[in-house]
Amino acid sequence: MAVKTYKPYTPSRRFMSNLSSSDITGKASVKSLLIKLPVSAGRNNNGRITSRHKEGGAKKFYRIIDFKRNKFNIQGKVAAIEYDPYRNCRIALIHYVDGEKRYIIQPSGLKVGDVVFSASSGLDIKTGFAMKLKSMPIGTIVHNIEMHPGAGGALARSAGTSAQIMGREGKYIILRMPSGEMRYILEECMATIGVVGNEDFANISIGKAGRNRHRGIRPQTRGSAMNPVDHPHGGGEGKTGSSGHPVSPWGTPAKGFKTRKKKASDKLIISRKKK
């Protein structure tokens, strides 16, 4: 998919780029698979800001995606490739032979007219097919991976991402995650074969503030531009550097400080992600 640039007829357009929509074939979304999500805009039930730099953004409908891929042994055909405003990859509309329609994340290379299947075992290693990890050979590239059997895919779902099966050990499969982390996943978990499409998403440049406002992202004020009451970096006469190490507004170190809580699932991580 090509990255589209624009003529610099305004300064904001000079470095702006976007993805070509030539791969989108769907004319209209399936209404039964659309819902309207409430917009919190970073506020809690008291109306107070709990997550900064968020707003409503452009109006959009959420597409109900089949992350579980649990329609076993029924053939489906790709009817359309569509844009999804809630994610950075494309989605594929699947028409099953029994009449049901579902959306799935579009793997790279999946096009209109292709056939997809889901089964617990016994399928060919083909892009878009979904099965349990225990049925896939070592070296298979997968995405939309479950962390708990039957819970639906949670790992490797964004544009251009994938994981690779590196080995087996007892009831676990060893996966190399997109970050480089090596971890165990139960062999009963489902996954979809292939790499998530829209790989060029990482190459686009937002270019102007208005596009981020449409995405629901508000401007971020530097701590050094605030008063001491508002931020540890605030205050001083004129432009002054902060004393000590950079911290968040609440005093947590901002550079390299680990904030991840310990979990029981830490034992399933073989090696941490690459530095």
Swiss-Prot record:
Family membership: Belongs to the universal ribosomal protein uL2 family.
- Please name the GO terms that the record assigns under molecular function: rRNA binding; structural constituent of ribosome; transferase activity
Q: Compositionally biased, Basic residues: which spans?
A: 257-275
Q: Which PANTHER family match?
A: LARGE RIBOSOMAL SUBUNIT PROTEIN UL2M, RIBOSOMAL PROTEIN L2
Originating species: Helicobacter hepaticus (strain ATCC 51449 / 3B1)
* Source domain of life: Bacteria
GO CC annotations, alphabetized: large ribosomal subunit
**Function noted in UniProt:** One of the primary rRNA binding proteins. Required for association of the 30S and 50S subunits to form the 70S ribosome, for tRNA binding and peptide bond formation. It has been suggested to have peptidyltransferase activity; this is somewhat controversial. Makes several contacts with the 16S rRNA in the 70S ribosome.
Q: Which InterPro entries match?
A: NA-bd_OB-fold, Rib_uL2_dom2, Ribosomal_uL2, Ribosomal_uL2_bac/org-type, Ribosomal_uL2_C, Ribosomal_uL2_CS, Ribosomal_uL2_dom3, Ribosomal_uL2_RNA-bd_dom
Keywords in alphabetical order: Ribonucleoprotein, Ribosomal protein, RNA-binding, rRNA-binding
The family database entries (NCBIfam families) matched by this protein are listed as: rplB_bact
Q: How does it assemble?
A: Part of the 50S ribosomal subunit. Forms a bridge to the 30S subunit in the 70S ribosome.
**Where is region (Disordered) located?**
210-275
Q: Tell me, which GO biological process terms does this entry list?
A: cytoplasmic translation
Annotated signal sequence is: none
PROSITE patterns, per the entry: RIBOSOMAL_L2 (PS00467)
Q: What is this protein called?
A: Large ribosomal subunit protein uL2
Q: Which SUPFAM superfamilies match?
A: Nucleic acid-binding proteins, Translation proteins SH3-like domain
